[in-house]
Amino acid sequence: MSERQAPAKWQRLEQWLLFLLLLLAAGLRFYRLDGSSLWSDEGNTWALLSRSFAQIAQDAAADIHPPGYYWLLKLWTLVAGTNAWGMRSFSALAGVLLVYVIFRLGRLLEDEQPSLRGVALLATLLAALNPFQIYYSQEARMYLLLALVSATLFWSLYRLLTSATGVSVGAVVGYAGSGIVGLWTHYSFPIVLAAAGLTFLVLYLSSSRIRKHKARGGPLGANQAIFWRFVGLNALIILAYLPWLPTAIARILHWPQGGESIPFVEGMQLTLRTLLFGSLREAPDLAWPWLLGAALLPLWALARRWQERSLWPLALWFLAPIVLMFGLGLFSDAFLKFLLTASPAWALLMAVGVWSLPKPRVWWPPFVAGSIALAAFTLPTYYTSPTTRDNYAGIARYLQATAQPAQALVILDAPGQQEVWQYYTKYDQLTMPTLALPQQRPPDPTATIATLEAAVDNRATLYALFWATDEADPERLVERWLDQHAFKGLESWQGNLRFVTYVQPTDLACNELSSPPRFGKAIRLTALCQPATPQTVAAGEVALVGLRWQTEAGLPQRYKVTVQVLDSRNNVIAQRDSEPVGGSLPTDQWPVGATVVDNHGVLIPPGTPPGAYRIIIALYDQNSGERLRLPDDHDYFVLGEVEVVRPQQSLPAALLPLQQLIHQKLGPLELVGY
């Protein structure tokens, strides 16, 4: 396959455009590199970097990743440092290199098919702006390195198959090196090697030259050297991985089940959405034009140019990770990043699809505009939202500003959060006792509860960080105990991390009600527990309502309790709805005649004007929403008043329970969100 040199003028223009695109890629990947919080897995990375190379390997043997990435990152951070910027800069650099490798792959396609001249720059632009690649270029994990070595592997494979000048040393070194690094980086890399091997066999066996040699009745002739060179390179890759192979097999056989099998159409929609927008939790409005283009352009490229064998490697490379996702049922947030290895092939197929349309010079400007618009809609959220990743940094700053360490306790459920929390306690100089539970897997209920009870004794405020509890604490042992014995206040999702505050009052006074109100036919409120009458609560803090229930007969239905704070116009200022005892003791399980201890904390919203507010409660059917009535025909009972005062310390905007953050200046005021 011969190479055709572009005119010198075009070459100079192409070089300048490539330089500008790489500059753009670097700017987007290094911009606000430490602007978002480290999350749990990045905390694990940070913890491993303080250990020796041998200890890293030993710890990785018990984890679900080989040690190669950690070894390389440890060398990198000897110069760059182990703070968030230093660790993430390794991935950012890998992200820029990936964009360059995509360009080189595009140039190889252009050399094979001169009609595709321009595809390399178009694919490079798409990769430079791609939110999926940018997001993982700003994470101290191995997934961008995995995408880079996958792309380098296929670039080397193309060179091995198309070199017109004999053996390409760069291709040989690139294939062997990327194969070795890939296997030592992630256990999913064998699917990429398999795709490369299948690509080689398909192209090699379909070669007209091979068919010609076969027709002569002899062996594969001169092309045998290509075949055995490829076999030798793969043997070298496997040989370099042999020391870790037994560990890898053991870890893969015990791979944790955390994915989800979904229908094909839904899986492809999620795949395309991820390739376009990355880990964005909500796609932009009117996303369908991008999704349609992401699906149709690669299909059009393959259908229009199927006879051109140079596109076959892209097709197999693109499909390999998707087949892995469907085959193992990995469609969940935790595994969508495996699609990064398909992202370079997808970018190239998208560009080829544009160039395969009638009059491509008419279509590429809208394609470029659409790519820029997609990045403009998506990237600001990645750069500015505090919940782009699990916001441990924001929580640490909040505790540093507001918590009283002598009276507080941080509870980590699950223990996998310990390393990232230690990072922020070190760099933010946060001194506060911390308890990680459950300490066994599977959890030991007796030991877990005993440890928790001892730790929370004499602690007025508990700060619970719930993360990945489906695996670490599937029975919700920690949360159920806290719901039963403390008063839940602020509850805020910070990425995939749920931050909850609990209050343990020391001055709670329980008063029997002289005329216990009856809800419906059987439920009575026998006592009310509060710190004082009336309570005094600062805006942003929690009003405490302790309810004591009894039922005179078995209850066939499940009812929810609603506690509401009303202003003078009966507007609801704050509200908490829950099944009794934090959902752990539904009404249809209440023992007849026994007292049910049911504690509720109601967060008074930040910004609530000072003044007196009424507290009411009601019980309602959780299916129909119909409230139980009292003998006076009211469907609520007034508990008393709460006095709201101004807070001494404002709640950080990142922790406010808002659906949308705006931060719009309105003269001397700021509209934070709604």
Residue ranges and their predicted role:
Residues 1-10:
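Short, Lys/Arg-rich, polar N-terminal cytosolic tail immediately upstream
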Residues 214-216, 221:
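Short Gly/Ser/Thr- and charged-rich N-terminal loops/segments
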Residues 397-404, 430-674:
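C-terminal luminal/periplasmic domains and tails of membrane-associated envelope-modifying transferases
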